[in-house]
C-alpha cells in the first residue's frame, strides 16, 4: 500500500491540475489513497504579487470544488481544506463546511508563500484552534522564505501541543537540516518527502524516528508520471535500502495513523 499525503488539483497560474489526471496517476503507479488540496485558493503569484481580487477564488468556493471531486472518489481521495488568511477569516461558514464534510476531510492546508502571510501570525490561530476542535492535522508548505520558514511552524507547534503539524518539503530550497532538527524536538511535528532527496529522507527518519515522516510528492504538478522523477523513483523501484518496517511506515502507516484514514 502507498498513500500520497501531498497532492493537488486546480487551475492556478501556470498549473492546470485536473482531478482525472491525479486519479489516473494514482492508478498507474499503484497509489491506494491520496490527500489532496485545491491550488485555486492561492492569493499571490510566484513572485508574490497579489492576484487581482476578481480572479481569486474564495475559501468556500475553492473547497466546495475540492469536496465535490473528493466526494465522488472518496475511496481514493481525502480532502485537505485550503485556507486564505491574507484576504479572508476563519469564519462560521468555513467551520460549517468542515462540519458537514468531516467524513472526507482529513486536514487543513496552509501555503504561507502563496498567501504571503506568516505562518505564526496571530490571525492564523483561529484556524489552528479549528484544527484542534475537529482533530485535524495542519499541513503546511515550508521553505526558505520568511513566511514559510520551518522555525515558524516549530514556534506554533509549541503553542498548540494538541495539534499535529506536517512540514511539507522539510524546508524547500534548503538543505533540510534545520527542519529535520526541529521535527525531532516535538512530538506533534512531522515532515514529508515532497522534493526531498532520499538521503535526507533517510536522515530525517534516523533523527526524528520512523513514525515522523510521510510520503508525499506534489502530484500531479509535473504530470501523472511525477512518480518516476529522481526524487521518487527509488520508492517504486524498491531501491531505498530501507527496512520493510521503516518503508511501510513511510509509505502508508504513518499517514493512516496521523490522519486517521480508514481504507480497505
Question: What are these model-predicted stretches?
Answer:
Residues 120-214:
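Catalytic pocket-lining loop regions of alpha/beta-barrel enzymes
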Residues 1-5, 16-37, 210, 223-264:
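Mid-to-C-terminal alpha-helical segments outside catalytic/metal-binding sites
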Amino acid at each position: 500500500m502507498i498513500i500520497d499525503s501531498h497532492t493537488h488539483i486546480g487551475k492556478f497560474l501556470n498549473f492546470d491540475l485536473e482531478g482525472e489526471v491525479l486519479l489516473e496517476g494514482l492508478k498507474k503507479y499503484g497509489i491506494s489513497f491520496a490527500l489532496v488540496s485545491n491550488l485555486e485558493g492561492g492569493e499571490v503569484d510566484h513572485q508574490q504579487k497579489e492576484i487581482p481580487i476578481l480572479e481569486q477564488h474564495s475559501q468556500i468556493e475553492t473547497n466546495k470544488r475540492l469536496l465535490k471531486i473528493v466526494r465522488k472518489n472518496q475511496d481514493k481521495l481525502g480532502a485537505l481544506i485550503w485556507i486564505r488568511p491574507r484576504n479572508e477569516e476563519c469564519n462560521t461558514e468555513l467551520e460549517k463546511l468542515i462540519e458537514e464534510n468531516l467524513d472526507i476531510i482529513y486536514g487543513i492546508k496552509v501555503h504561507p508563500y502563496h498567501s504571503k502571510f506568516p505562518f505564526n501570525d496571530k490571525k492564523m490561530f483561529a484556524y489552528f484552534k479549528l484544527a484542534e476542535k475537529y482533530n485535524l492535522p495542519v499541513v503546511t508548505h515550508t521553505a526558505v522564505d520568511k513566511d514559510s520558514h520551518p522555525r515558524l511552524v516549530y514556534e506554533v507547534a509549541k503553542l498548540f501541543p494538541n495539534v499535529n503539524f506536517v512540514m511539507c518539503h522539510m524546508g524547500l530550497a534548503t538543505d533540510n537540516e534545520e527542519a529535520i532538527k526541529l521535527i525531532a524536538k516535538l512530538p506533534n511535528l512531522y515532515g514529508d518527502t515532497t522534493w526531498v532527496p532520499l538521503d535526507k529522507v533517510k536522515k530525517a527518519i534516523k533523527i526524528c524516528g520512523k513514525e515522523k515522516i510521510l510520503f508525499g510528492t506534489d502530484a500531479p504538478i509535473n504530470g501523472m508520471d511525477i512518480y518516476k522523477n529522481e526524487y521518487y523513483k527509488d520508492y517504486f523501484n524498491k531501491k531505498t535500502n530501507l527496512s520493510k518496517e521503516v518503508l511501510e511506515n513511510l509509505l502508508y502507516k504513518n499517514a493512516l495513523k496521523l490522519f486517521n484514514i480508514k481504507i480497505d
